Amino acid sequence: MVNSVVFFEITRDGKPLGRISIKLFADKIPKTAENFRALSTGEKGFRYKGSCFHRIIPGFMCQGGDFTRPNGTGDKSIYGEKFDDENLIRKHTGSGILSMANAGPNTNGSQFFICAAKTEWLDGKHVAFGKVKERVNIVEATEHFGYRNSKTSKKITIADCGQF
């Protein structure tokens, strides 16, 4: 299986921050990677485009992927509402690691987070399935618009997304 690369065009209050590219580990985590890739392209009729990062915690992560309700309570995968943890072999080794947000075991949907630091306490609990390949500095810059309580001071949006 080919490791796809997707992109996000990120904006802050409608102003461009830049484009990040994300390599998906489809060779090891194919089902999770395919869900994210398809939600990036919109080929199933729904997508990440226009959704926001609703939870940003400096020194920890930036969470997004709720395109059904922009407040973090919505979740929808290409497989239905939720799907099982595929495997938990990848570690949360540092800034730029892409992982599934969940509400416990086997509750993956569309929500994801990008790590801003090493988060080893998430190993074995969240499926890490990709890594920011280019422009991780944009992810790091978005941290400045978050607070410890996970609220955001600016609207950070995925203005466009797709696959290279």
From Swiss-Prot:
Coiled coil: none
Reactions that this protein is recorded to catalyse: [protein]-peptidylproline (omega=180) = [protein]-peptidylproline (omega=0)
Superkingdom of origin organism: Eukaryota
Gene Ontology cellular-component terms listed: cytoplasm
Entry keyword annotation includes Methyltransferase: no
Keywords, alphabetical: Cytoplasm, Isomerase, Rotamase
Parts of the chain that traverse the membrane: none
BP GO annotations: protein folding
Family matches, as SUPFAM superfamilies: Cyclophilin-like (SSF50891)
UniProt GO MF annotations: cyclosporin A binding; peptidyl-prolyl cis-trans isomerase activity
Domain PPIase cyclophilin-type intervals: 7-163
Annotated compartments: Cytoplasm
E.C. code: 5.2.1.8
Keyword Isomerase: yes
Entry similarity comment: Belongs to the cyclophilin-type PPIase family. PPIase A subfamily.
Record's miscellaneous remark: It is one of six related genes or pseudogenes found in a cluster, thought to result from gene duplication, on chromosome 1.
PANTHER family: PEPTIDYL-PROLYL CIS-TRANS ISOMERASE, PEPTIDYL-PROLYL CIS-TRANS ISOMERASE A-LIKE 4C-RELATED
Function in brief: PPIases accelerate the folding of proteins. It catalyzes the cis-trans isomerization of proline imidic peptide bonds in oligopeptides.
Protein name stated in the entry: Peptidyl-prolyl cis-trans isomerase A-like 4D
Organism: Homo sapiens (Human)
